[in-house]
A protein has these predicted regions:
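Rossmann-like S-adenosyl-L-methionine
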Residues: 1-127
């Protein structure tokens, strides 16, 4: 759904999720390149990221410290960051802000009715 007419790179460390992404993209006829890569251990470089207009990331609870550093060093203009851990999100958000991004939107999402768990959906932009 996100691809539209644009080219999309989907990087995923979990092999089953990676293969499911490939199959879904093929089935939908979308131009999605699925990359089996653990961005926690091997983040995309600033040069790799700079080829894109926008980055969407949804890291594990530990956050995306190394990837946030590379994003901050890139020339990408927008970052959509989904997080299940406000503490790691805050750390990574600080790195993005130090790299010239401004937090444009932040929305807490309480998607689990009988839980105190909150997901954060945020948009960072460079002006």
């Amino acid at each position: 759904a996100l691809a539209g007419p644009a080219k999309v790179l989907a990087a995923e460390a979990d092999r089953a999720a990676h293969l499911a992404c490939q199959a879904a993209a093929r089935g939908a006829g979308k131009p999605v390149h699925s990359l089996h890569r653990d961005l926690f251990r091997d983040p995309l470089t600033a040069d790799e990221i700079s080829r894109f207009d926008c980055v969407l990331l949804d890291p594990p609870r530990a956050g995306a410290r190394n990837q946030a550093n590379m994003i901050a060093q890139s020339s990408v203009a927008r970052v959509v960051y989904i997080s299940c851990n406000p503490q790691s999100w805050a750390r990574d958000a600080r790195r993005l802000a130090d790299g010239g991004f401004r937090l444009a939107e932040l929305r807490p999402v309480g998607q689990f009715r009988w839980s105190t768990h909150v997901e954060l959906a945020s948009l960072f932009v460079r002006d």
